[in-house]
Curated annotation (Swiss-Prot):
<dbReference type="GO" id="GO:0048034">
    <property type="term" value="P:heme O biosynthetic process"/>
</dbReference>
<dbReference type="InterPro" id="IPR000537">
    <property type="entry name" value="UbiA_prenyltransferase"/>
</dbReference>
<keyword id="KW-0812">Transmembrane</keyword>
<keyword id="KW-0350">Heme biosynthesis</keyword>
<keyword id="KW-1133">Transmembrane helix</keyword>
<protein>
    <recommendedName>
        <fullName>Protoheme IX farnesyltransferase 1</fullName>
        <ecNumber>2.5.1.141</ecNumber>
    </recommendedName>
</protein>
<comment type="subunit">
    <text>Interacts with CtaA.</text>
</comment>
<comment type="function">
    <text>Converts heme B (protoheme IX) to heme O by substitution of the vinyl group on carbon 2 of heme B porphyrin ring with a hydroxyethyl farnesyl side group.</text>
</comment>
<comment type="similarity">
    <text>Belongs to the UbiA prenyltransferase family. Protoheme IX farnesyltransferase subfamily.</text>
</comment>
<dbReference type="InterPro" id="IPR030470">
    <property type="entry name" value="UbiA_prenylTrfase_CS"/>
</dbReference>
<keyword id="KW-0808">Transferase</keyword>
<feature type="transmembrane region" description="Helical">
    <location>
        <begin position="112"/>
        <end position="132"/>
    </location>
</feature>
<dbReference type="Pfam" id="PF01040">
    <property type="entry name" value="UbiA"/>
</dbReference>
<feature type="transmembrane region" description="Helical">
    <location>
        <begin position="34"/>
        <end position="54"/>
    </location>
</feature>
<feature type="transmembrane region" description="Helical">
    <location>
        <begin position="234"/>
        <end position="254"/>
    </location>
</feature>
<feature type="transmembrane region" description="Helical">
    <location>
        <begin position="299"/>
        <end position="319"/>
    </location>
</feature>
<feature type="transmembrane region" description="Helical">
    <location>
        <begin position="135"/>
        <end position="155"/>
    </location>
</feature>
Length: 320
């Protein structure tokens, strides 16, 4: 009987040790893959648009190497920022249902390991970007500092406008992708940055409305928590209403003189649907359900908009 109990105790100990072992999944989850994927889509969009509109285009192996380096470098720098974000937010995340299982919260990954992981990602990413040109590396470093330090450590904890402030570094990926090809700015690069900047607040405030009570419990002064859902809905609609006409400027920024009816129609339809959905928010009885719909559509809008911008710029590349 005693041997049986000892065997059971040993088995339980082995199970606990195995369950506490850090896995690849823990590292991936800590980097917030959802954010990295959306950032990578934007970065690739910027890269492709720059490639299609550049006077001297990359070809063959040079194109492939530049693209891979730019995408990996951008993803690594952004992942470094999200890992540092998880490190600084671990005590806050412990109070939220959707984040309390993260390895940074449970103690599965000790703080030193998290910082090492984030630092390695950041250094590797910046080195890749610097190998392309100093400007892209500088943009990556600036975005990291702004997001991981200014936004995460300071503004997120103290200001109702943290989402607005966080949009400055959050809009960097398409700019970085563009500059990876050109090595300098242009009206197109600034417009891509502006589009992603305006897209972010409605997207993240939709999450804020859905998870309002969790943010309240964690002490995060997010707009829905402090000002309420109605004010947040007004702000979301204002951003979307500005975003839609700004997206229509994209063909003009390329400076080719070619204006695509396809792009205008697609951008108007996508934007019109989002505006219509935002208006529905003032009539709904279920804010959480509405916010979920807004969140999902914001991702669809984002992906399709960048896709049609890439198609439009490539069509101009073919006819020039």
């Amino acid at each position: 009987m005693e041997n049986t109990r000892d065997s059971a105790a040993i088995s339980e100990t082995k199970y606990i040790k195995a369950s506490n072992r850090v896995t690849i999944y823990d590292f991936i989850k800590l980097a917030k893959p959802g954010i990295i994927i959306s950032n990578s889509i934007a970065a690739f969009g910027g890269f492709w648009i720059a490639f299609a509109s550049a006077e001297k285009t990359l070809t063959g192996l040079a194109f492939l190497m530049t693209m891979v380096t730019a995408m990996l470098g951008t993803a690594f720098v952004m992942a470094s920022g999200t890992v540092y974000n998880n490190y600084f937010d671990r005590h806050m995340d412990a109070k939220m249902a959707r984040t309390r299982s993260r390895a940074s919260v449970t103690g599965k990954m000790p703080p030193a390991m998290i910082l090492t992981y984030g630092s390695v990602l950041g250094i590797a990413g910046l080195a890749m970007l610097y190998s392309l040109n100093p400007l892209t590396a500088f943009l990556g470093l600036a975005a990291f500092i702004f997001y991981a330090i200014i936004y995460t450590v300071w503004v997120k904890r103290t200001s109702v406008w943290s989402t607005f402030v966080g949009s400055f570094p959050g809009a960097a990926p398409p700019l970085m992708g563009y500059c990876a090809v050109t090595g300098d700015f242009s009206m197109t690069a600034v417009l891509l940055y502006t589009i992603m900047f305006l897209w972010q607040p409605p997207h993240f405030w939709a999450i804020g409305i859905r998870r309002k009570e969790e943010y309240r419990a964690a002490g995060v002064p997010l707009l829905p928590v402090v000002k309420g859902n109605h004010v947040t809905k007004i702000k979301m609609m204002q951003y979307i209403a500005v975003l839609v006409p700004v997206t229509l400027l994209f063909p003009f920024s390329l400076g080719t003189g070619h204006i695509s009816p396809f792009y205008f129609l697609a951008a108007l339809v996508l934007g019109g649907i989002w505006i219509k959905k935002s208006i529905k928010g003032f009539k709904t009885d279920d804010d959480v359900k509405w916010a979920k719909d807004m969140f999902v559509y914001s991702l669809i809008y984002f992906c399709l908009l960048f896709f049609i911008m890439m198609i439009d710029s490539f069509m101009m590349f073919l006819i020039r």
